[in-house]
Amino acid sequence: MQQIMVSGTVAFLVSIFLTPVLIRYFTNRQLGQEIREEGLQSHLRKRGTPTMGGIAIIAGIVVAYVFTNILAMIQGVGGFTVSGLLVLGLTLGLGATGFADDFIKLYMNRNLGLNKTAKLVSQLAIALIFGFLVLQFPDENGLTPASTHLSFIRDIDTIDLGFGGSVFGIIVFLIFIYVVVSAWSNAVNITDGLDGLAAGTTAFVMGAYTLITFWQFRNSCDTAVEAGCYTVRDPLDLSVLCAAGLGATLGFLWWNAAPAKIFMGDTGSLALGGLVAGISVVSRTELLMVIIGALFVIEIASVAIQIGVFKTRGKRVFKMAPIHHHFEALGWAETTVTIRFWLIAIMAVLAGVGVFYSDWLHLAEV
């Protein structure tokens, strides 16, 4: 528990103090967000607001994770693990993609940033590398960071995407990992359209997973094989990483809350999406994440529905997509939308954690 608290605190401090440095840097160089003329008129006031604040979030996560693990090694109570490093690598890889996108927008005056092909290839390569590596590095019990089984609260034994380790099965598993990584990174990216919405929602999700992974650590099959134990590798280190994600997003939210002094940009949203995706895979809770991250699911689903219906029927389901802009178009104030969406996110998190704990109670009583 001490490691988790240290990680969250360090991440918060790094993020909250580094963010204003970035605000001054980008403001002094007149590097800010471009706002589309065809968008909501109320958003035009945001033109010129500094972006790339995700740098502070990533820095907070990295510094906190590294500091906490070095401290644990000095004290002889833990250290870096394969699972944690792989998720951190996924986070940094997607963050680098987002950084390149933001850099091109700001410094090369190309409003669209990376072209779609370059972004797709980058996400695909990063996801495939992650998917391959999470099946490597077995520990002394033969447990790898992830398994080829689809998972809800734990692995579903009857659904093996790897088909017993066949070449076809591994391809199917890698495709699945790409879908998970792409979906979550794009979902967080799409949600980042209102001041504080993506940062706050991610903080709720990371808070939930800090608890979940710590519970997996306390009830790990590595320490005691009993009813309800979890076959998750390195759960304590994953909890440390989740706490870093929680602290870093809260520190950034201090400056990103309405009226935002800075945006996280693709640097932050893609990185956080990678963190969400990676944690769901290595904690073996991919389907549970759909409940806990339900607001992200709603946001990306609204875009898919809008595009699908418009292309097939020539009609729009929403006034604007993603759905948070729909409510703005109906006349809701931005802060009203954000707070109400936060409430939805909190209810989803509570529901997901409740399902997770209920499963453990049921198995523990058997």
UniProtKB/Swiss-Prot annotation:
Family recorded in the similarity comment: Belongs to the glycosyltransferase 4 family. MraY subfamily.
Pfam families in alphabetical order: Glycos_transf_4, MraY_sig1
Organism: Corynebacterium glutamicum (strain ATCC 13032 / DSM 20300 / JCM 1318 / BCRC 11384 / CCUG 27702 / LMG 3730 / NBRC 12168 / NCIMB 10025 / NRRL B-2784 / 534)
Reaction it catalyzes: UDP-N-acetyl-alpha-D-muramoyl-L-alanyl-gamma-D-glutamyl-meso-2,6-diaminopimeloyl-D-alanyl-D-alanine + di-trans,octa-cis-undecaprenyl phosphate = di-trans,octa-cis-undecaprenyl diphospho-N-acetyl-alpha-D-muramoyl-L-alanyl-D-glutamyl-meso-2,6-diaminopimeloyl-D-alanyl-D-alanine + UMP
Membrane-protein topology: Multi-pass membrane protein
Gene of this entry: mraY
UniProt-listed PANTHER family: PHOSPHO-N-ACETYLMURAMOYL-PENTAPEPTIDE-TRANSFERASE, PHOSPHO-N-ACETYLMURAMOYL-PENTAPEPTIDE-TRANSFERASE HOMOLOG
InterPro entries hit by this protein: Glycosyl_transferase_4 (IPR000715), PNAcMuramoyl-5peptid_Trfase (IPR003524), PNAcMuramoyl-5peptid_Trfase_CS (IPR018480)
Domain of life of the native organism: Bacteria
Keywords of this entry: Cell cycle, Cell division, Cell membrane, Cell shape, Cell wall biogenesis/degradation, Magnesium, Membrane, Metal-binding, Peptidoglycan synthesis, Transferase, Transmembrane, Transmembrane helix
Record's keyword annotation contains Oxidoreductase: no
Cofactor: Mg(2+)
Protein role: Catalyzes the initial step of the lipid cycle reactions in the biosynthesis of the cell wall peptidoglycan: transfers peptidoglycan precursor phospho-MurNAc-pentapeptide from UDP-MurNAc-pentapeptide onto the lipid carrier undecaprenyl phosphate, yielding undecaprenyl-pyrophosphoryl-MurNAc-pentapeptide, known as lipid I.
A GO cellular component entry from the record: plasma membrane
Pathway note: Cell wall biogenesis; peptidoglycan biosynthesis
Location of this chain's protein in the cell: Cell membrane
GO molecular function annotations of the record: metal ion binding; phospho-N-acetylmuramoyl-pentapeptide-transferase activity; UDP-N-acetylmuramoyl-L-alanyl-D-glutamyl-meso-2,6-diaminopimelyl-D-alanyl-D-alanine:undecaprenyl-phosphate transferase activity
BP GO annotations: cell division; cell wall organization; peptidoglycan biosynthetic process; regulation of cell shape
EC top class named in words: transferase
Record EC number: 2.7.8.13
Segments passing through the bilayer: 3-23, 54-74, 76-96, 118-138, 161-181, 197-217, 238-258, 262-282, 287-307, 341-361
Protein name: Phospho-N-acetylmuramoyl-pentapeptide-transferase
